[in-house]
């Protein structure tokens, strides 16, 4: 095949559809004044529209990450609000801690965004991730 013919081919990425769950954003950035800062908020467009976020300086422990969840104005959504399933706070807390540790231990990373992360009754799943160096 010539290069020209190969560049005309369409490529697709097909992935299994993830089940519904509560969507959050987990992120961190190396701030020039504060150092590694970790963010948690509602995911998708809600992160930008509502501004309901919690911030902490890394490193974080599990208790710090759990407190970030409680700090959200929307924290009731994690507890089975209006009959929705109760979310796995412990699994989300582990992701929050891990993202903080990655930014803390990797000076070349300026920013990490996991958005959305779906939180389920058992476990979490990052559906999209961006790392900026």
Model feature map: region roles:
Residues 1-133:
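ATP-dependent carboxylate/acyl-activation modules
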